[in-house]
């Protein structure tokens, strides 16, 4: 067996067993294999063609139009591009917020993804961490107490639409209530919908986080629920914010509006292929199947004596942290005394049953040791 086969087999085997990360497993893009022999570069703004004509910008624009639609907007009022992932999308949203309000303070909960602190450091923005509730949602009383002392300063609200560990959703209505109560006139709302951006539009009741609710920017992961071999994301913003930072670059013949200059041209192709094949109805069915799987796992875990719970209609099942051996075998993300299983497309009930049997054995061994 050569080294390349060894690498492939290791990754393939580990892909089959993981349960703790939000990555779909049921995709195949084999028909795009010939593209691996090409350098595809979507340099610059997706809406303007470059002097470098080896891109997939037509397909990228179709993707952006699709996401504008499911986020209750259109490409006249909003603009976006395919990013390298959720972190870049959050960086871009915070960058636009800073350009709008250079003296603002960013408010975000302690359950926010670790990369956001790094983004805030890179952008050198003043920020304050807000406490979280037990379910991972922002503590609005704490936000109110903090904001009350800073009501005269511009504010940037960084809201989580599905936290990393518990899939908690910060309530936009609560934040808007506080904004109104303290008459904050200069503010910007960014939503980190890395995981739920492709799920929440099809959940009942639908979380409030899109452009119809007055948000300014939204970051979404493209490779998680949709699935794909290369990490990617989508960032959507109000067009007026993008226009504020746009610069023309003559030698590439396009506008400079994105974080990176050279941009991956393969990932828009994968997203475009998924959208063409499945559309909104396909995403809706995908969400329903994953929710049913999560409900099954939550019920079965509690049946065998493992305390488990979910936020409303979540795909993330939070459970008491199992042994190191089980966490390693199933690649479970854990924090303090909890771990989680995320019921993504491609995970089958049979795999969950094997996981449940392993937990049963572990519980039986613990009971025997106590006798």
Predicted feature locations:
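N-terminal entrance/gating region of PLP-dependent enzymes' catalytic architecture
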Residues: 1-77, 337-342, 370
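Glycine- and acidic
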Residues: 44-51, 76-80, 127-132, 154-161, ...
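Hydrophobic face of alpha-helices
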Residues: 57-60, 64, 90, 172, ...
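Active-site C-terminal subdomain of aminotransferase-like
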Residues: 201-313
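Short glycine/serine- and small hydrophobic-enriched flexible loop segments
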Residues: 69, 95-99, 272-277
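Catalytic cores of large soluble enzymes that bind and process phosphate-bearing ligands
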Residues: 27, 31, 47-59, 82-85, ...
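Conserved C-terminal alpha-helix-loop-beta "cap" of PLP-dependent enzymes
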Residues: 6, 117, 247-258, 281-371
């Amino acid at each position: 067996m050569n080294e390349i086969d060894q690498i492939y087999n290791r990754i393939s085997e580990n892909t089959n067993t993981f349960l703790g990360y939000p990555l779909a497993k049921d995709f195949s893009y084999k028909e795009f294999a010939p593209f691996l022999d090409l350098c595809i570069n979507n340099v610059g703004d997706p809406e303007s063609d470059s002097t470098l004509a080896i891109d997939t910008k037509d397909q990228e624009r179709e993707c952006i139009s699709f996401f504008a639609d499911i986020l209750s907007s259109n490409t006249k009022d909003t603009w976006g591009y395919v990013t390298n992932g959720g972190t870049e999308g959050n960086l871009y949203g915070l960058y636009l917020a800073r350009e709008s309000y250079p003296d603002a303070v960013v408010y975000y909960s302690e359950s926010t993804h670790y990369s956001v602190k790094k983004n805030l450091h890179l952008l050198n923005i003043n920020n304050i961490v807000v406490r979280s509730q037990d379910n991972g949602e922002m503590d609005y009383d704490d936000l109110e107490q903090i904001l009350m002392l800073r009501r005269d300063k511009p504010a940037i609200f960084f809201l989580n639409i599905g936290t990393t560990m518990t899939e908690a959703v910060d309530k936009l209505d609560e934040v808007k209530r506080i904004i109104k109560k303290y008459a904050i006139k200069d503010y910007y709302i960014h939503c980190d919908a890395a995981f739920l951006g492709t799920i929440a539009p099809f959940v009942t009741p639908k979380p409030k986080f899109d452009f119809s609710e007055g948000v300014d920017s939204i970051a979404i992961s493209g490779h998680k629920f949709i699935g794909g071999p290369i990490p990617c994301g989508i960032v959507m913003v109000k067009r007026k914010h993008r226009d504020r930072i746009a610069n023309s670059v003559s030698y590439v013949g396009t506008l400079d509006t994105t974080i990176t200059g050279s941009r991956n041209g393969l990932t828009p192709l994968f997203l475009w292929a998924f959208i063409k094949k499945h559309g909104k109805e396909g995403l809706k069915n995908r969400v329903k199947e994953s929710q049913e799987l999560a409900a099954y796992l939550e019920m079965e875990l509690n049946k065998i004596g493992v305390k488990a719970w979910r936020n409303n209609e979540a795909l993330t099942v939070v459970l008491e942290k199992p042994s190191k051996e089980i966490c390693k075998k199933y690649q479970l993300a854990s924090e303090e005394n909890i771990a989680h299983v995320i019921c993504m497309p491609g995970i089958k009930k049979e795999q969950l049953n094997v996981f449940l049997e392993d937990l049963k054995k572990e519980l039986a061994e613990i009971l025997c040791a106590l006798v």
